[in-house]
Amino acid sequence: MARITAEDCNKIIPDRFRLVVLATRYAKLLNYKVETNQIKKEKRDKPPVISLRRIAAGKVSVPQLEQDLINSLRTRMMIEPLINQDESEDVEEKFEYLPEVYIGEDYSDLDDQIFINENGEDYETDK
């Protein structure tokens, strides 16, 4: 890909994993935000390469990009409890037709099961 650009970015952001996360975030921002004038100049390159080049050139504020990433990952609304009493009863009613299955700890209940490999042939379980 852009090895020279990634090596240049390592001078600014020494941790590769952090670099990948921040460059990905900035590339997504390039795709979603309106920066058409700047992107048209670099039209032949894709957003990940553009973001790496801008990070290497120091055109991107790394602390601000980190803060933007953290803000995007935060949950902004409270999550309701996943299980309501009414909903759990409805789920039980929907699955009443399914047979109850018990598998013992020694898995002896599976001895009479048929296992088929990817060729459609039965596995030999006596081996």
Swiss-Prot record:
Gene3D superfamilies: 3.90.940.10. SUPFAM superfamilies: RPB6/omega subunit-like. It catalyses: RNA(n) + a ribonucleoside 5'-triphosphate = RNA(n+1) + diphosphate. InterPro entries: DNA-dir_RNA_pol_omega, Pol_omega/Rpo6/RPB6, RPB6/omega-like_sf. Pfam families: RNA_pol_Rpb6 (PF01192). NCBIfam families: rpoZ. The RNAP catalytic core consists of 2 alpha, 1 beta, 1 beta' and 1 omega subunit. When a sigma factor is associated with the core the holoenzyme is formed, which can initiate transcription. This is DNA-directed RNA polymerase subunit omega. It comes from Rickettsia prowazekii (strain Madrid E). The gene is rpoZ.
